[in-house]
A protein has these predicted regions:
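Accessory nucleic acid-recognition modules appended to NTPase machines
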Residues: 1-78
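Domain-level recognition of nuclease-like catalytic cores that cleave nucleotide substrates
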Residues: 117-146
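Active-site ExK catalytic segment of metal-dependent nucleases
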Residues: 75, 80-90
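Flexible, glycine-rich phosphate/dinucleotide-binding loops
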Residues: 18, 66, 91, 120, ...
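Short beta-strand/turn micro-motifs composed of small residues
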Residues: 86, 114-117
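Intrinsically disordered, low-complexity Ser/Thr/Pro/Gly-rich regulatory segments
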Residues: 24-25, 44, 77-78, 106-109, ...
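Short, charged, amphipathic alpha-helix that recurs within catalytic cores of restriction-modification
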Residues: 88, 93-107, 111
Length: 146
Protein backbone atom coordinates (compact mmCIF):
# COMPACT_ATOMS: atom_id res chain seq x y z
CA UNK A 1 0.00 0.00 0.00
CA UNK A 2 1.48 3.37 -1.01
CA UNK A 3 0.90 6.45 1.09
CA UNK A 4 0.62 10.07 0.01
CA UNK A 5 3.75 11.98 0.87
CA UNK A 6 2.62 15.54 1.60
CA UNK A 7 3.25 16.53 5.24
CA UNK A 8 0.61 17.56 7.74
CA UNK A 9 1.44 20.79 9.58
CA UNK A 10 0.51 21.46 13.19
CA UNK A 11 1.22 24.60 15.17
CA UNK A 12 2.81 24.04 18.58
CA UNK A 13 -0.04 25.96 20.18
CA UNK A 14 -3.34 25.79 18.26
CA UNK A 15 -4.30 29.13 19.78
CA UNK A 16 -1.47 30.79 17.85
CA UNK A 17 -3.27 30.09 14.58
CA UNK A 18 -6.38 31.83 15.86
CA UNK A 19 -4.36 34.80 17.09
CA UNK A 20 -2.48 35.08 13.78
CA UNK A 21 -5.82 35.14 11.96
CA UNK A 22 -7.16 37.64 14.49
CA UNK A 23 -9.93 35.21 15.45
CA UNK A 24 -10.27 36.24 19.05
CA UNK A 25 -13.95 35.41 19.63
CA UNK A 26 -15.57 32.07 20.37
CA UNK A 27 -14.25 29.02 18.49
CA UNK A 28 -16.26 28.37 15.34
CA UNK A 29 -17.52 24.92 14.39
CA UNK A 30 -15.17 24.81 11.39
CA UNK A 31 -12.14 25.32 13.67
CA UNK A 32 -12.90 22.66 16.27
CA UNK A 33 -11.49 19.70 14.36
CA UNK A 34 -8.11 21.29 13.67
CA UNK A 35 -7.84 22.66 17.21
CA UNK A 36 -8.68 19.27 18.74
CA UNK A 37 -6.15 17.52 16.48
CA UNK A 38 -3.47 20.03 17.50
CA UNK A 39 -4.33 19.59 21.18
CA UNK A 40 -4.18 15.79 20.78
CA UNK A 41 -0.74 16.03 19.17
CA UNK A 42 0.49 18.20 22.04
CA UNK A 43 -0.82 15.69 24.60
CA UNK A 44 0.76 12.74 22.75
CA UNK A 45 4.14 14.47 22.54
CA UNK A 46 4.05 15.46 26.22
CA UNK A 47 3.29 11.89 27.29
CA UNK A 48 5.99 10.56 24.97
CA UNK A 49 8.57 12.77 26.69
CA UNK A 50 7.64 11.25 30.05
CA UNK A 51 6.96 7.61 29.21
CA UNK A 52 8.27 6.65 25.74
CA UNK A 53 4.74 6.25 24.42
CA UNK A 54 5.94 5.74 20.82
CA UNK A 55 9.09 5.59 18.71
CA UNK A 56 7.60 7.30 15.69
CA UNK A 57 4.56 9.51 15.14
CA UNK A 58 3.11 10.17 11.70
CA UNK A 59 -0.21 10.27 9.91
CA UNK A 60 -1.49 7.91 7.26
CA UNK A 61 -3.13 8.71 3.93
CA UNK A 62 -3.18 6.10 1.14
CA UNK A 63 -2.57 7.27 -2.43
CA UNK A 64 -5.58 5.47 -3.87
CA UNK A 65 -8.17 7.08 -1.56
CA UNK A 66 -8.09 10.88 -1.49
CA UNK A 67 -10.62 11.31 1.31
CA UNK A 68 -9.17 8.58 3.54
CA UNK A 69 -6.66 9.30 6.27
CA UNK A 70 -5.81 8.58 9.88
CA UNK A 71 -4.78 11.58 11.96
CA UNK A 72 -2.06 9.86 14.00
CA UNK A 73 -0.15 6.63 13.48
CA UNK A 74 2.04 5.72 16.43
CA UNK A 75 4.76 3.10 16.03
CA UNK A 76 6.40 1.18 18.84
CA UNK A 77 8.66 -1.60 17.62
CA UNK A 78 6.71 -3.36 14.87
CA UNK A 79 3.32 -2.45 16.35
CA UNK A 80 1.12 0.42 15.19
CA UNK A 81 -1.68 2.28 16.93
CA UNK A 82 -4.00 4.24 14.62
CA UNK A 83 -5.77 7.25 16.14
CA UNK A 84 -8.49 9.37 14.55
CA UNK A 85 -9.77 12.55 16.24
CA UNK A 86 -13.32 13.83 15.69
CA UNK A 87 -14.67 17.04 17.23
CA UNK A 88 -18.21 15.67 17.21
CA UNK A 89 -20.49 14.62 20.10
CA UNK A 90 -21.57 11.49 18.18
CA UNK A 91 -19.69 8.86 16.26
CA UNK A 92 -20.85 7.74 12.82
CA UNK A 93 -19.60 4.96 10.52
CA UNK A 94 -18.58 7.54 7.88
CA UNK A 95 -16.11 9.09 10.34
CA UNK A 96 -14.31 5.76 10.73
CA UNK A 97 -13.42 5.11 7.07
CA UNK A 98 -9.71 5.81 7.61
CA UNK A 99 -9.54 3.46 10.59
CA UNK A 100 -11.33 0.78 8.57
CA UNK A 101 -8.90 1.18 5.67
CA UNK A 102 -5.79 1.05 7.85
CA UNK A 103 -6.92 -2.29 9.27
CA UNK A 104 -5.32 -3.89 6.18
CA UNK A 105 -1.90 -2.52 7.15
CA UNK A 106 0.19 -5.15 8.93
CA UNK A 107 1.04 -4.61 12.58
CA UNK A 108 -1.93 -2.41 13.58
CA UNK A 109 -2.77 -3.52 17.13
CA UNK A 110 -5.39 -0.89 17.97
CA UNK A 111 -7.66 1.38 15.94
CA UNK A 112 -9.00 4.16 18.09
CA UNK A 113 -11.32 7.11 17.42
CA UNK A 114 -11.59 9.96 19.92
CA UNK A 115 -14.76 12.03 20.04
CA UNK A 116 -16.61 14.55 22.21
CA UNK A 117 -19.26 12.08 23.36
CA UNK A 118 -19.51 10.33 26.71
CA UNK A 119 -19.68 6.61 25.90
CA UNK A 120 -16.99 4.10 25.07
CA UNK A 121 -18.04 2.15 21.99
CA UNK A 122 -16.67 -0.68 19.89
CA UNK A 123 -17.66 -1.40 16.30
CA UNK A 124 -18.27 -4.89 14.93
CA UNK A 125 -14.90 -4.77 13.17
CA UNK A 126 -12.99 -3.86 16.34
CA UNK A 127 -12.60 -0.08 16.11
CA UNK A 128 -12.72 1.47 19.58
CA UNK A 129 -14.44 4.83 20.01
CA UNK A 130 -13.47 6.69 23.18
CA UNK A 131 -14.46 9.96 24.81
CA UNK A 132 -11.53 12.31 25.40
CA UNK A 133 -11.49 11.55 29.12
CA UNK A 134 -11.02 7.81 28.45
CA UNK A 135 -8.05 8.70 26.22
CA UNK A 136 -6.50 10.88 28.93
CA UNK A 137 -7.07 8.15 31.54
CA UNK A 138 -5.42 5.56 29.28
CA UNK A 139 -2.39 7.81 28.82
CA UNK A 140 -2.13 8.49 32.54
CA UNK A 141 -2.36 4.78 33.40
CA UNK A 142 -0.06 3.66 30.55
CA UNK A 143 -2.91 1.71 28.91
CA UNK A 144 -3.10 3.32 25.46
CA UNK A 145 -1.37 0.33 23.88
CA UNK A 146 -3.22 -3.00 24.26
Amino acid sequence: MRERSHPKLYWVDPGLVRAAKRQLGPVGAEERGALLEGWTLTVLRAHNEQSDLFEELSYWAPVQARETEVDFLLRKGKAYLALEVKAQPRSSPRQLSGLRAIGDLGGVVRRLALYLGNQRLRTEDGIEVWPLQAFLDALKNHKLWP
